[in-house]
């Protein structure tokens, strides 16, 4: 099943149809590695430290040299060397980078150690890396969730994937990233408030335990998301003083006035209930 999942992740990659569904069983039984971009298959296996799969790919005559492009820990390097890997030359790296079949993913897997274009030469490497990571994650959120799970490693990467999934209502990926992120609730609140996204806000409440509606209203006030503030009041939010102060602090004067008026309505309603 793992192998099948590995293969099916490549049906559509960056909008390109790499092979037809009818060929899946043929590939499992025959030389399927000639259809999948061989370097990418080896690099993905190396990236997730699946030594068994690396060995099988090596037996199918896929060069283990590609694995050395993406591993940096001693056990993985030793394993590659034990299979006869030779470190790829600079020229080989350049040649691989020109293969547009898997160019973006390849650059990402190399931890952004690819060669910058002329336009990028004056851009710091860490900035190039961050831009590339974000572009890759954004593409994979829509096109290849199996591959996305393979390339996400750091908290920052999970956070951005969670942000993209929430922004575009990709619920399965949102739930996966939520489980992996230690700051999921905060990220979702910022995303849904900045985009004024009710669906995202609902995910945050339903799945993340974000029952602190007052805190949610404060976050919404930062982005002048009055619709979400109204929503919080409808769900039971009662204290708008901090949200009002936050809106004023961020220069959202109309939002601050809105919070003040809402607080008055809430207090009148509470007093009426007490009188009854």
UniProtKB/Swiss-Prot annotation:
Induction entry: Expressed in the early phase of the viral replicative cycle.
Domain of life: Viruses
Keywords: Early protein
Similarity annotation: Belongs to the asfivirus MGF 360 family.
Function: Plays a role in virus cell tropism, and may be required for efficient virus replication in macrophages.
The protein's name: Protein MGF 360-15R
Species for this entry: African swine fever virus (strain Badajoz 1971 Vero-adapted)
